[in-house]
Amino acid sequence: MVINDLLWRRPRHHMDVDEAHDHVHWVELFFDLVHVVTIFILGNYLSHHLGWQGFWVFTGMFLAIFYAWADSSVYNSLYISTDMPHRVAMALKIVTMMTIAAAIPDVGGEGWMYFALAYALNRALTAYLYWRARCTDNAANTLAQEQARNFFVLAGVF
C-alpha cells in the first residue's frame, strides 16, 4: 500500500509510534556537518574582525545559525519523517546553510543580502515542515500549528 511506503508517509509524532527508536538518519548527520563548517567559517570571520563591530556581527550570525540548527534538531526529535517532501526540504535547508556559509566572508558588503535571504528561506522551510506535521492525531498538532505560524512570521521578518 502506498501510504505505508516510507517515501510517502506523512510525519508522525514519536509518541504515536509503537516502536519509536532514536535512529539518526544520514541527512540529519550531513545537516549537522554543514552547520559545523558554517561555524568554522564564522570563526574565521571573527579572527579577521577583532573589533567590537566584528564581535557583534559574529554574535548575531552565530545566534541565527545556532537557532537554525536547533530548531531543525527539535523538529527531527519530535517527528518521525522519512518521506520524499521531508528529504527535499532538508536538502534545501542544507543549500540555504551553504549559501549562508558562502556569504559570511563578505557579510559587511553584498554578503548580508545573501545571508538574509538564505536565512529567511531556511526559516520558511522549517515552518513548512511544522505545517506538514500539523496532521498528527494528538495534542502535538497544536504545537505544530503554532510553530508553523511562528516560523512563517520569522521568515517574513527576514
Can you say where each PLM-predicted feature lies in the sequence?
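Multi-pass alpha-helical transmembrane bundle typical of ion/small-solute transporters
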Residues: 1-158
